[in-house]
Amino acid sequence: MEALQNIGIKRRLRRFFRRDGRALIFAMDHGFEHGPTDFEPVWEHVNPRVIIRKVVRAGVDGVMMLPGMARIAGDDVKPEVGLMIKITSKTNLRPKAEQLMQSQLAFVEDAIKLGADAIAATVYWGSPQEDAMMRQFAEIVSYAHDLGFPVVQFAYPRGPYIDEKYGRKEDYRVVMYGARAAAEMGADMIKTYWTGSRETFAKVVDAAAGVPVLLSGGAKAENPLDFLKVVYEVIEAGGSGAVVGRNIFQRENPEPMIKALIRVIHRNEDPEEAAKAEGLL
């Protein structure tokens, strides 16, 4: 039975990764986690069906969204595109003291019923609520793996202890620790912060012990070339791609950025050449 479960996990992971072992995944959880103001730069993208259709047409390998958006726009994710459903989240409306906890929004079986190929959940490593999120993640992994579904951890070091000891959450030592902890808990894919250099991100990849590590895209870069350069460094460091939201949906026409990212991630193209080829420079 265990062998069959592992086959299911591997087959579903391949829905996100091309033969090169890399992936570009579009992230669409911002309306809940950050609020609809994230869509104000391009307001039509507040409609999930509008932006999902655009990114799927442009060639992303996967789409990540919360359960409610999967109900609304899941049909717009073509069968050849992987669907990742994140079942933990939080809002920015919470009191500050409670911002470092992710609550469970749905169960593994709910995501499966919505057509998920992978289940995602966040752990804020180092937060005062770390224990609760560890228990939550362990239960998700156990249940999903029993059914043959891969689990993605958004491994985000965060909290006052992290700030006090490391100075910033992107310090490679704590990002590396979070990635290793995610792998130790059974994650099949890890999304985490950029550490500032190829050399330090390579250590994060090494610490993950073979579990694919993808970049968390973060805030929109005003100069698209700057973001493409970061993604290039991630790939050169052994990273497996990127999960990108604002650097895509906060652009009036997201297609050139998506196609430039595909060039960098899947073809190892120089960022400047990729940007020029897609009219970003």
Swiss-Prot record:
Transmembrane segments: none annotated. It is found in: Cytoplasm. Its main location: cytoplasm. It comes from the Archaea. SUPFAM superfamilies: Aldolase. Keywords: Cytoplasm, Glycolysis, Lyase, Schiff base. It catalyses: beta-D-fructose 1,6-bisphosphate = D-glyceraldehyde 3-phosphate + dihydroxyacetone phosphate. One of its GO terms (molecular function) is fructose-bisphosphate aldolase activity. SMART domains: DeoC. The active site is at 191 (schiff-base intermediate with dihydroxyacetone-p). Activated by citrate. It is an enzyme of class 4 (lyase). GO terms for cellular component: cytoplasm. PANTHER family: 3-HYDROXY-5-PHOSPHONOOXYPENTANE-2,4-DIONE THIOLASE, FRUCTOSE-BISPHOSPHATE ALDOLASE CLASS 1. Homooctamer. Belongs to the DeoC/FbaB aldolase family. This is Fructose-bisphosphate aldolase class 1.
